[in-house]
């Protein structure tokens, strides 16, 4: 009887030891990348691509480490300090991804300015369904009519200059926002056009008079640019930026691969199939690093308070976002709620990649993200 009890105890001890070793190995596997995701905001992608990729995975690494912490309580509670330390180290990064306060705009706010940033994806111009042509644009205009922003910055803006498509944008927006048809109240710049008829670029519309404007070339020969408009607000001048950093340039095959990836995680050839996406991500990280450097130089030379709106094509844990956000407050962090997701991909994870940053002298109220318009 005593021998049998000893045997049971030995088996139990061996199982606990196996559990401890397995959990420790998993802890290291998910703990190190979480440390790298913390470092992603400081280390340029050109220095370490692995750190940059860990930044993308931050939300998933955070959840994994929380689960590990919970499991250590039942195995060896002293070891939960590993993941707990890493989670606490990332407190600031967590704050960039999740918000619970949701500060609402006061009922009376005479000095408040309503600002909107919107990547309109060419107003859904290339919708493959003929019957849907122009409907995406109308949804956007209806939304603008309801929200009535004082300042709106557009990325992936489209202008049908000759009105050959009967696809009016600039005139319609001026009418919708009840702005004067005067270039002192809007600024648009198009780095790319087709046959000098169809123009693609960025735009800023404002109810406040523009006293100066210009373009910031972020990369030679690239369509990714920033534009700015200095507006007169009361006795102050405020600089508004609308920016669009480089995207990953995923194509149809990449999206199909992404869908396959999410459904076939056990495929031994998965790394080969996703290699193209990996390479595109790596290139995009490094390009955004250089683009942010150019933009920061321009921002540093400005003597006015700044509001910076745009599609960064990068996450809150990224080097690009954190380099730009250093000098500013983030509307989501100051007055947002939830995750603030702005990219809803079918094949890829959802992220916050669009931002409004602003001068630290100002205050933010009622940051919201609309999910009602699909274009």
Task: Name each region found by the language model.
Residues 22-34, 39-70, 81, 215-217, ...:
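Metal-dependent phosphoester-hydrolase catalytic domains
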Residues 74-85:
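Membrane-interfacial entry segments at the cytosolic side of transmembrane helices
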Residues 145-149, 178, 210, 300, ...:
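Sec-exported extracytoplasmic/periplasmic mature domains
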Residues 114-120, 139-166, 229, 239-244, ...:
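Active-site beta-strand/loop signature of hydrolases that rely on acidic residues for catalysis
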Residues 74-75, 145, 234, 300:
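Residue-level signal for alpha-helix termini/capping positions
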Residues 1-17:
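N-terminal Lys/Arg-rich, disordered targeting/topogenic segments
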């Amino acid at each position: 009887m005593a021998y049998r009890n000893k045997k049971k105890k030995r088996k139990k001890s061996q199982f606990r030891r196996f559990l401890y070793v397995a959990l420790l190995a998993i802890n290291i596997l998910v703990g190190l990348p979480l440390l790298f995701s913390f470092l992603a905001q400081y280390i340029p992608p050109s220095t370490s691509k692995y750190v940059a990729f860990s930044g993308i995975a931050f939300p998933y690494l955070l959840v994994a480490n929380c689960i590990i912490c919970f499991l250590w309580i039942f195995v060896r509670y002293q070891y939960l300090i590993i993941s707990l330390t890493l989670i606490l180290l990332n407190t600031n990064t967590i704050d960039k991804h999740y918000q619970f306060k949701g500060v609402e705009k006061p009922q009376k706010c005479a000095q408040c300015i309503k600002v909107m940033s919107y990547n309109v994806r060419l107003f859904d111009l290339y919708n493959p369904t003929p019957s849907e042509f122009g409907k995406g644009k109308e949804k956007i205009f209806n939304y603008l009519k309801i929200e009535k922003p004082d300042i709106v910055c557009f990325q992936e803006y489209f202008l049908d200059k000759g009105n050959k498509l009967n696809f009016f944008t600039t005139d319609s927006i001026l009418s919708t926002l009840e702005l004067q048809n005067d270039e002192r109240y809007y600024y648009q710049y198009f780095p790319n056009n087709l046959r000098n008829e169809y123009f693609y670029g960025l735009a800023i519309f404002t109810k406040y008079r523009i006293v100066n404007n210009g373009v910031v070339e972020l990369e030679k020969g690239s369509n990714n640019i920033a534009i700015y408009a200095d507006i007169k607000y009361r006795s102050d001048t405020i600089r508004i930026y609308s920016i669009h950093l480089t995207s990953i340039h995923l194509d149809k095959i990449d999206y199909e691969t992404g869908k396959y990836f999410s459904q076939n995680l056990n495929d031994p050839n998965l790394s080969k199939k996703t290699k193209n996406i990996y390479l595109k991500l790596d290139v995009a990280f490094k390009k955004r690093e250089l683009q942010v450097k150019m933009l920061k130089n321009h921002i540093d030379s400005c003597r006015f308070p700044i509001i910076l709106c745009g599609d960064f094509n990068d996450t809150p844990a990224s080097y690009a976002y954190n380099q730009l956000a250093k000098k500013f407050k983030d509307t989501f962090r100051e007055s947002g709620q939830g995750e603030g997701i702005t990219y809803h991909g079918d094949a890829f994870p959802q992220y916050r990649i669009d931002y409004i940053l602003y001068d630290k002298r100002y205050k933010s109220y009622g940051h919201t993200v609309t999910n009602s318009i699909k274009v």
